[in-house]
């Protein structure tokens, strides 16, 4: 009895079983200690850089040395009456010198802040994102989800700049007996999705929708051959230039020659339509404008070249005609000027023949031109002011240029040594892709009506189809591969027909 009573009394005195009140948990004490240490270590200024304040040491050392070197030991006693005023004056002087020293040092370190000692060296503005993180969620997952590429409009625009361009052609067709001549224009793609190309003495039509092939006509004379061709805007008629100095107009739907235009004294190597006006460039150095509606079709002659005219292009609004020649000259003819038969501008910066001409579809009065093997440059011109806006050295002969109607880009075809197609981003002229495969120079290019595919015709006797400007949200990859397989079988049949 006594022992049990004594044990109960002892437990009551020690209160071993009673819970402790108003006692902080261990993690709370640790957090409070860390906060107190952090507050003690922080300076009053709260800046992110510490500069020691030692600028008064030299002044103090000077004063001590001056006092110790005083030859009169009684000077201190004699001047005891003025010690108070001397101390005040010295303190004021020290403060002024200290301020000047601070300002000088601050101006050297903080030039942009004009001596603001409270300014920070580094400024961190973009903070890590904060999400609703529960106890069971990894906190780093919030950072990963918030900082993925494409989460902001800027990232999305950067992502679009680096789109995928297929490096292999989508289709390859045989083009036997195509003429290997830099000064001719032998390929065009109509608005009805039909490609026209002369092989030998025969003009062939290939329907890109149905994959059907058609022989349009063959020249009659044995020594004659096709030198140029151009579709009308609606795709119903085809103009064909020949080595016999004539131009033939064909109704494709009825496979019928509508008329024949004469007048040139040399082969017709370049053609360009502007509504019912057909412009033709010849090796006789002249450009003829024909009104195909009337019997007397020849309406004007443009004489501005001294050698063969090998490039002709009307602007999209029909107001200007660009011509390039073997004399390395580009002429701009303004139809709205009082004297249309005199070039509004003449550009002589190219050092080789100029056949590659292309008007920009999204910026008026912007013309891209390409020079031959001795020049190798692409130049951009403002055809109103006559100023050369930019020049890019492509390191190879420029055969043709095509602008994209979907992107702010253009594609150029080249000769020796790579025989490649280059895709450029405008206006930076950064090379987006380089498409190789031709074993000889890619003389001609044309773009499809939907603006996605570029076809190239080469002296290696092949046609290659490149899906360069593919639009977004297209068919899945599996469907596209199955389509390519079916197209491949069609191509073999077409090649056998051509052969």
Curated annotation (Swiss-Prot):
**Pfam families, A to Z:** WD40_CDC20-Fz
Q: Give me the stretches of Low complexity compositional bias.
A: 34-43, 67-92
Q: Can you tell which superkingdom this protein's organism belongs to? A: Eukaryota
| Listed InterPro entries | Cdc20/Fizzy, WD40/YVTN_repeat-like_dom_sf, WD40_CDC20-Fz, WD40_repeat_CS, WD40_repeat_dom_sf, WD40_rpt
Q: Classify the main location.
A: nucleus
Question: Which keywords does UniProt give here?
Answer: Cell cycle, Cell division, Mitosis, Nucleus, Repeat, Ubl conjugation pathway, WD repeat
- Which CDD domains did the record assign? WD40 (cd00200)
PROSITE patterns documented for this protein:
WD_REPEATS_1, WD_REPEATS_2, WD_REPEATS_REGION
| Cell compartment(s), UniProt | Nucleus
Q: Which GO terms describe its molecular function?
A: anaphase-promoting complex binding; ubiquitin ligase activator activity
A GO biological process of this protein is:
cell division
> What PANTHER family does this protein's entry cite?
CELL DIVISION CYCLE 20 CDC20 FIZZY -RELATED, FI02843P
* Name of the molecule in the record: Anaphase-promoting complex subunit cdc20
User: Which gene is annotated as encoding this protein in its UniProt record?
Assistant: cdc20
């Amino acid at each position: 009895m006594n022992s049990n009573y004594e044990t109960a009394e002892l437990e009551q005195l020690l209160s071993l079983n009673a819970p402790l009140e108003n006692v902080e948990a261990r993690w709370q004490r640790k957090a409070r200690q860390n906060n107190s240490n952090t507050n003690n270590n922080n300076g009053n200024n709260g800046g992110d850089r510490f500069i020691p304040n030692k600028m008064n040491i030299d002044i103090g050392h000077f004063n001590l040395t001056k006092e110790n070197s005083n030859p009169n030991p009684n000077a201190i006693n004699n001047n005891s009456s003025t010690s108070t005023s001397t101390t005040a004056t010295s303190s004021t002087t020290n403060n002024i010198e200290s301020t000047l020293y601070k300002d000088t040092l601050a101006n050297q370190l903080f030039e942009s802040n004009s001596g603001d000692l409270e300014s920070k060296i580094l400024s961190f503005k973009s903070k890590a994102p904060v999400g609703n993180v529960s106890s069971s969620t990894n906190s780093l997952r919030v950072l990963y989800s918030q900082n993925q590429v494409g989460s902001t409009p800027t990232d999305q625009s950067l992502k679009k700049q680096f789109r995928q361009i297929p490096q292999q052609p989508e289709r390859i067709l045989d083009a036997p007996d195509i003429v290997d001549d830099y000064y001719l224009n032998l390929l065009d793609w109509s608005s009805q999705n039909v490609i026209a190309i002369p092989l030998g003495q025969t003009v062939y039509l290939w329907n890109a929708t149905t994959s059907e092939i058609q022989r349009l006509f063959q020249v009659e004379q044995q020594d004659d051959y096709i030198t140029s061709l151009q579709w009308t805007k609606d795709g119903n008629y085809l103009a064909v230039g020949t080595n016999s100095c004539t131009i033939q107009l064909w109704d494709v739907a009825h496979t019928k020659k509508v008329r024949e235009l004469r007048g040139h004294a040399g082969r017709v190597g370049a053609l360009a339509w502007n509504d019912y006006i057909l412009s033709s460039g010849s090796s006789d150095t002249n450009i003829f404008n024909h009104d195909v509606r009337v019997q007397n079709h020849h309406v004007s002659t443009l004489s501005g070249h001294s050698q063969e005219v090998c490039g002709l292009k009307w602007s999209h609004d029909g107001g200007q005609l660009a011509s390039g020649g073997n004399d390395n000259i580009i002429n701009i003819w303004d139809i709205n000027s009082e004297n249309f038969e005199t070039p509004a501008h003449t550009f002589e910066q190219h050092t080789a023949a100029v056949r590659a001409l292309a008007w920009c579809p999204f910026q008026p009065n912007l013309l891209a031109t390409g020079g031959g093997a001795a020049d190798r440059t692409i130049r951009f011109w403002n055809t109103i002011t006559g100023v050369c806006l930019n020049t890019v050295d492509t390191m190879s002969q420029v055969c043709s240029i095509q602008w994209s109607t979907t992107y702010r880009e253009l594609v150029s075809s080249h000769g020796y040594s790579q025989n490649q197609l280059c895709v450029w981003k405008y206006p930076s002229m950064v090379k987006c892709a380089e498409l190789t495969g031709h074993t000889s120079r890619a003389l001609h290019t044309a773009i499809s009506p939907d603006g996605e595919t570029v076809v190239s015709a080469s002296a290696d006797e092949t046609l290659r189809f490149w899906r360069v400007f593919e639009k977004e949200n297209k068919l899945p990859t599996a469907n596209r591969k199955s389509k390519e397989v079916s197209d491949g079988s069609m191509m073999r049949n077409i090649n056998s027909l051509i052969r």
